[in-house]
Amino acid sequence: MKKEKEQLINCWLKSGIVKNKRIIAAFRSVKREYFVLSEFRKEAYSDTALPILAGQTISQPTTVVGMLEALELKPGMNILEIGAGSGYNAALMGRIVGKKGKVFATEIIPGLVSFARQNLDKAGIENVKVINTDGSIGYVSGSPYDRIIVTAASPEIPEELVQQLKEGGIIVIPVGSEIGQTLIKAKKTKGKLVRQQLGEYVFVPLKGRYGY
C-alpha cells in the first residue's frame, strides 16, 4: 500500500493540487485503510470514493486533499467539519492543526458516529471530537471556528455556519442540487462571504434542517 500512497502523492505534487506540505505529511501519517470497510482495504489507496455505512462514502483522496488545500489549514486552528463519515478527513485535519488545534466533526447518522470514533481511536487521533448532531446548523458549543468544511452537498450555505465562522475564516462547501454541485470556497469579510468557485463535483446530499 505504501507504493500506491506515494504514487498519489507524486501525482498531486506534479499537478500542483497540493502545495501545503502539512497535508502531505498528514496523508503519509494517517492510514486510510483504518477508515474503510474491511472488504475495501486493498483499495484504500485507489483514487476513488468507497462505500462505508448507511449509503455514505469516503471521498476519493484527490477530492479530500483538494478541499484541505482550499481550507488553508494551519497549526492551532479550531475546525468544524459537517459530515464526519468514517472520520478520515477529520483525522487528516487533526494531524495538520496539531496538538494545539481542535477538530469538531458532526455526524447525523448514529452508526457512522460509532464507526468514526472507533477509526480515530485506532489511528491514535486525540484532538478530534465526533458529535452526533445535525451539522447543517453547525455546532455552537465549539464556535467560533477558523475553518468550516462541509463534506456533503448543500442547497445553499446555511446562515448558522456563517455566524459560527470567525471574521477572516474560510468555509469550503459543495453547493447545488442533489445531482451536481459547485465546490465553493468562501472567506468571511466584514461579516459577509466572498465566494470563489473551485469546480464541479457530486457529493452525497446533506441531511438535516438545511439539507435535502
Regions found by a protein language model. Name each.
Residues 72-194:
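Conserved nucleotide-cofactor-binding alpha/beta core module
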